Amino acid sequence: MKAAAITPGKKDSLRVIDVDRPRPGAGEVLVRMLEAGVCGTDEELNLGIIGEAPAGSDYLIIGHENLGVVEEAGKDVRAFRKGDLVVATVRRSCPGMCFACRTGQPDMCDSDDYLERGIKGMHGYMAEYYTERPENLIPVPQSLRKVAVLLEPLSIVEKGIEQAFKIQERMIWRPRRALVAGAGPIGLLAALILRDVGLEVSTFATRSRESLKARIAEAAGIEYFNVKETPIEQIAELQGPLDMIVEATGSSEIAFKAIGLTDSNGIVCLTGLSPEQRTHSVCTDCVNQDLVMHNKAVFGTVSSNRVHFERGIDRLTSIERRWPGLLERMFSRRVRLENVKEGLKGDKEDVKVLVEIGA
């Protein structure tokens, strides 16, 4: 079968290879891939910045945003049958089975020994077929066929926003306004979730107000700003007191600014990674004083587990019901598996690129 693979640590090594089609064990499911999403992680893998091949392999099949259909279920599998739509979770428990992993929360793993399909120590989903244990597969209703490939990134934001509301149980909290920094796929999904729970939401990016990102945001009643024209500080002034900020750019500078722009008793959720180790001058006393005197909370979030995927199904359904067809507009480009390298070449209008694998 065909698969998209890299040599970990080697720049621009992405290529399509031929590998044996996997065979499911008695307790496994064989899934035929339909499509995979491309994200910044895949770009970092191809740049050689991150990535770890499975033990005994010199290559890594990439792909973690996925949608497939059950081709065959092992004889001991009862939960799935041929033709079922499924999305697979990504992170797997560490070998030492820390407390978080033992309790079904590998996304909160206490060690760095966890595995991630398509990223760290396990082959991913950008292949014609893969096998998986049924407990790692999420059933998808046919009504979500066109957008379910967004479930994995949405699950990450679903987790972050859920945690924010859980943390804010420290008081009686009635949030009204939220700002999402960044309008990429994670940012747009965060903004849509916050709109879905009833908040007034704004977002910003470097694209114009005529861009696809802006049009998607504004179609859901999310106010969009071009940060090149309206600085983040001015956005906060225009929007009024901000109860919550979701940082989805990966800019540490913006992350620190977000703390100061959040209103008293507010919360900042950090979802963006900052791998470049840049430094900025920050008044650390000012940050500490602001956090303490105004009861602010800041936390980071990464990955997700089965619970967030399952809740994500309900969220996708709700968003589709409220804004029909809006999620599908995020798919700005589609490429075939054999042209996967084209999918990693950025286009100024890209929001989410899909790699089409099967019919």
From Swiss-Prot:
Gene3D superfamilies: Medium-chain alcohol dehydrogenases, catalytic domain, NAD(P)-binding Rossmann-like Domain. Its EC number is 1.1.1.47. It comes from Methanocella arvoryzae (strain DSM 22066 / NBRC 105507 / MRE50). This is Glucose 1-dehydrogenase. GO terms for biological process: non-phosphorylated glucose catabolic process. Transmembrane segments: none annotated. The gene is gdh. Catalyzes the NAD(P)(+)-dependent oxidation of D-glucose to D-gluconate via gluconolactone. Can utilize both NAD(+) and NADP(+) as electron acceptor. Is involved in the degradation of glucose through a non-phosphorylative variant of the Entner-Doudoroff pathway. Belongs to the zinc-containing alcohol dehydrogenase family. Glucose 1-dehydrogenase subfamily.
